[in-house]
């Protein structure tokens, strides 16, 4: 089972990453959320969004430039989808640009810059710009097109918009659909994705096909490198669920730390303190010798008797775990027969979310073990070797694995990423406990793979901030205090 791993585990980390790239099938179709992450991570790698917008608009132009049409009408929203439409209009050098909204409402720098260029070109008369609030303001255009050969470009709403169409978009879409029924010489092209129930003849999408694209979509490359799909960057952090300003206690996550023993009491405390920076409630379940050492009133404490957690504590632990969104398991647990019995029985009976770290990784019975999608493992290289993962059957690994190291490799059966934040200061004891608590906190309200990626990034970036301030001379507690700084920078 371990033959694949033994060949590379202690070699170059990138060698493992390349092997995983071969084993994990690349996605041909991605979700809008995944595309947004890739788009932002391309910027993280240094590719400006205004360049991607230029490439997207130019790709649409190249597809339509030879169409024989009397008129080109480009409906643009105030987001980056509209920005793509502005670029299309510039390359066409003619047509009517209908901005649904006001110039002051254009949301991004790159879209605003492209609109400014259009305004300058409009002074020459070939491009006409109209800002509208209501669909009725373009009735004259629809009337004019009833007997003309025309191309209508839909750059109204991109992949980031959900729910029912609001006005005036709904009525504009209805009018375009009605026009197509009257005049068969109307050709409708959507940019990236169709707006609502619009009956497009062609959709030109970018980089990869999206799950919401219809069969008429074609894919155009716009200069996003493969690395943007694999790197963990600020795009991942932006995808995390945002805290609702109207939420109340408990709605932003509840984490239970299960660990500690007579030998190690600091590990669960560090994990708990890291989690508390993000979620609403943190509980610690441990033996009395750990609980007695905790001097943090922020925690909810659950005490059991003995030197180690053991099978006699399973039923009580299961009852407590039901109150929480996620369990972080293993920090300071100790690796012996008692903890092994406890952990394997607990996992067999508990079906919630679990972050499995440290000693918990060592005492799992991996014979016939099911790598559930509810699990995130956070091993270092020796613990990873112990897990005995067979890369030839990686499709069975539904759990997310965070292989810690100079570069963190995060993967499961369907996903693979690499995190390059962090430095040698993170080799100190306790920093792994911080990471486990951090990932657990994110996992409370987000999906497993995103939580693992973001936890690794935040932990490493916090270390990078400390490296600038203190060199390598920082502690796990210093690391915890930097977590909010990282989140404020990137969210």
Curated annotation (Swiss-Prot):
Residues spanning the signal sequence: none
An annotated GO BP: metabolite repair
Residue stretches making up the YjeF N-terminal domain: 35-230
Cofactor(s) of this protein: K(+)
Region spans: NADPHX 1: 80-84, 158-164
Protein family per UniProt: In the N-terminal section; belongs to the NnrE/AIBP family.
Role this protein plays: Bifunctional enzyme that catalyzes the epimerization of the S- and R-forms of NAD(P)HX and the dehydration of the S-form of NAD(P)HX at the expense of ADP, which is converted to AMP. This allows the repair of both epimers of NAD(P)HX, a damaged form of NAD(P)H that is a result of enzymatic or heat-dependent hydration.
Protein name, entry field: Bifunctional NAD(P)H-hydrate repair enzyme Nnr
Protein species of origin: Methanocaldococcus jannaschii (strain ATCC 43067 / DSM 2661 / JAL-1 / JCM 10045 / NBRC 100440) (Methanococcus jannaschii)
Gene that specifies this protein: nnr
